[in-house]
A protein has these predicted regions:
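Non-catalytic interaction/regulatory segments
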Residues: 1-164, 168-372, 380-393, 433-437, ...
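Metallocofactor- and cofactor-centric catalytic cores in central/energy metabolism, strongly enriched
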Residues: 381-469, 473-534
């Protein structure tokens, strides 16, 4: 018995008997645990019809506590055995503020999410439109986190980069009977009307993308707005992001922020550009040249509605870059059957007007949230090292300068030069961890190169797996050590052997079974193997 129950009882009786007067009450307390309340309802019509059973049911329901209703909801949802187990764990877990805002039936959904949390999965979420606000642009996000609350300074930029405007946030701690403490953070947000169409489908994509951002598998930037505004997946948005990173390296003056705003203004064009890329490199059914030309013309037709010349130039450059792209590993999967966490693009830079001189014959650009790298090659038979660069903004310029110098040196060794470089984007400050991260980034870079390079088996060229090729056979890829990678050659050769690459431990010079290139005047044994085949 409490005041809230007494007031609700008064309301039920007043409504049942259509009374406008205040319902009077007297409460009697005894030495037992029970209390008795006598109510007096004054009515103007003694002949009013009423249903005693309905009144009793309403009073019984009113007397049930939030915890009682939670138990019933858990039993109905999970069955008797599991429901009772969850009830024992969660019956006293929620704070009063939570119970005042959340219905017991909704708490069951939250409990299901809380039960998914463990040491390997510390974040779960719900993203939904409240029924009572279905006609507005309000959406809700509930984040469930194990052990500790999420810092607003961490999550707010992520949500804003998805184009969401946070208008309210409420944290709740959940203290279970087994001593565990988890947290629920409930956000109210405004979403652009473009993101309201087919909300269920977009919701699933948003949850997957936000989970990837939280785990550092997806970058936290404005390209993520296209998940809600353009209907892209987080991985599809990474296609546009990868090309934006490449644009930066070839000296295009537009900032990434400006490119992001261009596509935010024209999300339907962003979707068409991604579709052009997907159709060109689809493994199952790559589009014909005629179809690709038609898709390109459709994008150009959209430019009639693009008023800003800079936006026009950016969109045209994206089409140029996709046309110039010869191969990608975008549709490859790893040993676990998941799409790879990095994107490799083999590009013919002579087809891109913005590329500075000298223009390589081919280049491979590797992008991931952890590492970016480029491998420039001025011919099919080329040699050169891979450098661990610290010039994140212009490492391609550094590599291009090195390869020009290499070409002069190579006139007495191998006809043309090549050079590669990569930058690590999430380097820790501790020395040992710093080196380890550098090695892991190097591995990603090497895998990115090998993913889209053909192999040779029994003297025959074997095309790269799950790669749609828009160029001739190309199985020539040799690397060497350079600044920062002097001790990495065995790592590269190990990956080459893992890929069953035809050069094996000749892939990278300087390893434990490679040649001493300084003594012998060569950079890579593999380069000579390539010459033999030419």
């Amino acid at each position: 018995y409490n005041t809230a129950l007494r007031r609700e009882t008064q309301d039920i009786l007043a409504n049942a008997f259509n009374s406008d007067d205040k319902v009077e009450f007297t409460t009697y307390f005894s030495e037992s645990t029970l209390a008795r309340t006598h109510y007096t309802v004054r009515v103007t019509d003694n002949n009013i019809e009423y249903n005693v059973k309905d009144i009793e049911n309403n009073l019984i329901e009113a007397a049930r506590t939030w915890e009682d209703k939670l138990q019933s909801a858990l039993l109905e949802s999970a069955g008797e055995a599991r429901g009772n187990e969850l009830n024992r764990k969660y019956c006293n877990a929620f704070a009063r503020s939570y119970k005042e805002e959340v219905l017991p039936s909704a708490a069951v959904v939250d409990i299901e999410k809380l039960e998914m949390l463990n040491d390997d999965n510390k974040l779960e979420m719900l993203f939904y439109r409240p029924q009572e606000e279905a006609s507005s642009n309000i959406v809700r996000l509930s984040l469930f986190h194990k052990d500790e609350p999420i810092h607003l300074s961490d999550v707010m930029p992520m949500l804003e980069n998805f184009g969401l405007r946070v208008v309210g946030e409420t944290p709740y701690s959940v203290k279970t009977s087994d001593g565990g403490i988890n947290w629920i953070m409930d956000f109210s947000m405004l979403i652009d009307s473009k993101g309201m169409a087919d909300f269920d489908k977009i919701s699933a994509r948003f949850r997957a993308a936000l989970t990837s951002v939280w785990a550092n598998r997806l970058e936290n930037d404005g390209f993520n707005r296209l998940v809600l505004m353009g209907g892209l997946t987080g991985r599809e948005a990474s296609i546009l992001r990868a090309y934006a990173k490449y644009m930066r390296q070839i000296g295009v003056t537009f900032s990434q922020t400006y490119i992001e705003s261009t596509f935010a203004n024209y999300p339907h064009i962003a979707a068409k550009i991604v579709n052009l890329f997907a159709k060109k490199f689809s493994v199952k059914s790559p589009a014909s040249a005629k179809t690709l030309e038609k898709l390109g013309l459709e994008i150009y037709a959209e430019l009639e509605n693009v008023a800003n010349l800079d936006d026009d130039r950016i969109i045209r450059l994206y089409v140029d870059m996709i046309v110039a792209t010869l191969r990608t590993n975008y549709f490859q999967k790893d040993a676990e059957g998941k799409f790879k966490s990095y994107i490799s693009l083999k590009i013919q830079p002579s087809l891109i007007p913005e590329v500075p001189l000298p223009v390589p014959a081919f280049e491979i650009f590797v992008y991931s949230p952890r590492v970016e790298g480029v491998h420039l090659r001025f011919g099919k038979v080329a040699r050169g090292g891979l450098r661990w660069s610290d010039r994140r903004e212009d490492f391609r310029t550094e590599v291009l300068g090195l390869v020009k110098a290499q070409q002069v040196k190579n006139t007495v060794i191998v006809p043309v030069g090549s050079k590669g470089g990569f930058v690590c984007k999430q380097l820790p400050s501790e020395r040992e961890a710093f080196i380890k991260e550098g090695q892991e980034c190097y591995k990603i870079f090497i895998r990115g190169l090998l993913d889209i390079t053909d192999n040779i088996e029994r003297g025959e060229v074997v095309p790269a797996v799950d790669v749609t090729r828009h160029d001739e056979d190309d199985a020539y890829l040799v690397v060497a050590a350079d600044k920062g990678t002097a001790t990495f050659s065995d790592i590269a050769n190990g990956i080459a052997i893992e890929y069953n690459f035809w050069l094996g431990d000749a892939f990278a010079s300087g390893g434990s079974v490679g040649y001493d290139h300084k003594k012998m005047g060569i950079t890579a044994r593999g380069a000579w193997q390539s010459v033999k085949r030419h």
